[in-house]
């Protein structure tokens, strides 16, 4: 049936936006129109416009972890965001509303439910996200990335996390590792905003390694941190030996070429590592509002697909020692174990569900 429309709600970091784009692309290939509901400041403003998808922006940035004044401001913005969300739903008349997780889904999801629009919530982590917990009464389905506690409810459906098709089509680990020689190729990824602890530790760890044990390093810093990280490598005498990037625009290519990734343990990051079949050193972000990343890292490590390195245990000497002890046989084993955990085709399964709810 032609002329169907999906409203994708995702904002903030790449972990919400990139899987939303994967589902959007799949639905577009089936003839659907896509409209995006985001905010004025998140990464969606960088990633969505180049796709040609219309981006509607709410003046809302969340209320958790902002302090008293920030929380009050967020609460006022939230009230306005409910009205703005309703206006966008009336304007675009979506057949399905797709929430990718995070605070931006709250006003749009509530209004979708009140206006009798089918609402699909994507829960990337094993545990139930707070925003999704609040929205469950309004939801038609809760799509889960992992078979964890979030998947236990009556509305839950385990599909895996939507991953870009370019990553799912990366060659198998054995084919990629065949014939590789020379220094290990290591990719450091701190997420779309960068990771302070990785930015501070990697230059020191590289400096502690003898030249013959030093990997060929590509380090994604986050745009705001690029100059400081560049200065740290310069001070260590290593600037010319390291490729620095503020943001990775060609992640499928980078994953296919590297031997190891050092990164955080967000659900989408972990899902992409599994889809690509890439070994990793996972340094999860653990904050007062969530421990989802720690759970993800432990799950990967228990499966033999990654090394779990808690942030409080991360130091330059330890990381240098870990890197010095690696060889490609070890890395290939972990790469194949990661690939075995992948749930390929998740974007298609979420798109199938959207079509079912729209009556196709």
Swiss-Prot record:
Enzymatic reactions: di-trans,octa-cis-undecaprenyl diphospho-N-acetyl-alpha-D-muramoyl-L-alanyl-D-glutamyl-meso-2,6-diaminopimeloyl-D-alanyl-D-alanine + UDP-N-acetyl-alpha-D-glucosamine = di-trans,octa-cis-undecaprenyl diphospho-[N-acetyl-alpha-D-glucosaminyl-(1->4)]-N-acetyl-alpha-D-muramoyl-L-alanyl-D-glutamyl-meso-2,6-diaminopimeloyl-D-alanyl-D-alanine + UDP + H(+)
Residues annotated as binding UDP-N-acetyl-alpha-D-glucosamine: 13-15, 164, 192, 293
GO MF annotations in UniProt: UDP-N-acetyl-D-glucosamine:N-acetylmuramoyl-L-alanyl-D-glutamyl-meso-2,6-diaminopimelyl-D-alanyl-D-alanine-diphosphoundecaprenol 4-beta-N-acetylglucosaminlytransferase activity; undecaprenyldiphospho-muramoylpentapeptide beta-N-acetylglucosaminyltransferase activity
Transmembrane segments: none
Subcellular location as annotated: Cell inner membrane
Biological processes annotated in GO: carbohydrate metabolic process; cell division; cell wall organization; lipid glycosylation; peptidoglycan biosynthetic process; regulation of cell shape
Record Pfam families: Glyco_tran_28_C, Glyco_transf_28
InterPro entries, alphabetized: GlcNAc_MurG, Glyco_trans_28_C, GlycoTrans_28_N
Entry EC no(s): 2.4.1.227
NCBIfam families cross-referenced by the UniProt entry: murG (TIGR01133)
PANTHER family for the chain: GLYCOSYLTRANSFERASE (PTHR21015:SF22), UDP-N-ACETYLGLUCOSAMINE--N-ACETYLMURAMYL-(PENTAPEPTIDE) PYROPHOSPHORYL-UNDECAPRENOL N-ACETYLGLUCOSAMINE TRANSFERASE 1 (PTHR21015)
HAMAP family: MurG
Protein name (database record): UDP-N-acetylglucosamine--N-acetylmuramyl-(pentapeptide) pyrophosphoryl-undecaprenol N-acetylglucosamine transferase
Encoding gene per record: murG
